[in-house]
């Protein structure tokens, strides 16, 4: 299978293909040097072809693998996959500018490449919280193919709702590929927590004095037993209760990993684990996104959290690829 991955990040699609035992020639467009570092550390066979805005406008004539990509004929790519930046589309951004924003407007670069490459299949991923208007524009541009919303919580311990547009080239036109909702594997946060993990950053280990209200204090002191839940369960907060100050139970799902949020625990959420509140480790975040434990260990924790927050959820991509590979 010949694959072109746009906004490739840490090559989640390559990981999904590996787990499905699908051989591939994998071409990746990515500009984040740390994400590329992670990708190269895990897969030395990926051909990195640079900034999406320069594709088919410039390439390294001294790199034979680049030339191999550019010499391919239109229609030779089997799969085009990408998740264009969501920052201007996400409800998390108060002044979101939609598809006119500097980053989310890169969707149109994806569209340009889709029309130039004409792959047999395409997958586009983006946030489910985008406005109705943005969703309608993307759907219209993608040949009226309707997206399916899949929550990663069905396949992992993370609550992460995303839209997926999946199309197949049939007689010169793109048609909808029917994707079924995955079956719930009933994986919860408690199932992926590292054993013996100790957080040495004291500011993440809280006691009752950090809390304004009594709910969390009561929970810690009485040690109440709970059932498991299929969504994030918020126990309480400290300071002003912003996203990075909220504490959740590991008996539910994690909140959605975030690449850019600030605050003490905003990228992963804070969770009550063995009597203290802490953020998740990068290994635990790898598990939430379906990667091997040490997938991002080549970079700092800061860059590891960021790259995982920007990534696809591997089991979801595997689920979609199963539907595609069966008809290739």
Predicted regions span which residues?
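Class I SAM-dependent methyltransferase "Motif I" SAM/SAH-binding loop
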Residues: 6-11
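Extreme N-terminal starter segment of soluble prokaryotic enzymes
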Residues: 1-3
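Conserved SAM-binding strand-loop segment of SAM-dependent methyltransferases
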Residues: 45-52
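Conserved SAM-binding loop
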Residues: 39-40
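Short beta-strand element of Class I
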Residues: 25-27
């Amino acid at each position: 299978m010949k694959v072109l991955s746009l906004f490739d990040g840490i090559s989640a699609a390559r990981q999904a293909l590996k787990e499905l035992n699908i051989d591939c020639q994998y071409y990746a467009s990515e500009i984040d040097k740390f994400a590329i570092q992670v990708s190269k550390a895990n897969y030395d066979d990926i051909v990195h072809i640079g900034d999406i805005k320069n594709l088919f406008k410039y390439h390294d004539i001294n790199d034979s693998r680049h030339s191999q990509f550019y010499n391919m004929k239109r229609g030779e790519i089997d799969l085009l996959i990408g998740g264009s930046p969501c920052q201007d589309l996400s409800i998390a951004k108060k002044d979101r500018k939609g598809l006119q924003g500097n980053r989310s407007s890169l969707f149109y670069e994806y569209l340009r490449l889709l029309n130039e490459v004409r792959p047999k299949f395409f997958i586009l991923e983006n946030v489910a919280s985008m406005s109705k208007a943005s969703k309608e524009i993307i759907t219209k541009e993608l040949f009226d193919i309707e997206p399916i919303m899949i929550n990663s919580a069905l396949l992992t311990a993370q609550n992460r709702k995303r839209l997926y547009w999946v199309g197949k080239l049939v007689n010169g036109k793109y048609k909808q590929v029917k994707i079924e909702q995955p079956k719930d594997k009933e994986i919860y946060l408690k199932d992926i927590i590292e054993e013996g993990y100790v957080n040495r950053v004291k500011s993440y280990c809280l006691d009752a004095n950090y809390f304004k209200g009594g709910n969390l204090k009561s929970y810690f002191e009485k040690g109440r037993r709970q059932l498991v839940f299929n969504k994030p369960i918020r126990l309480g907060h400290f300071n002003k209760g912003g996203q990075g100050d909220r504490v959740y139970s590991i008996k539910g799902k994690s909140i959605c990993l975030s690449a850019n949020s600030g605050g003490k625990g905003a990228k992963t959420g804070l969770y009550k684990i063995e009597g203290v509140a802490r953020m998740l480790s990068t290994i635990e975040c790898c598990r939430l996104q379906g990667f091997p434990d040490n997938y991002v260990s080549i970079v700092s924790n800061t860059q590891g959290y960021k790259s995982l927050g920007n990534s696809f959820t591997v089991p979801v991509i595997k689920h979609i690829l199963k539907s595609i590979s069966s008809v290739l």
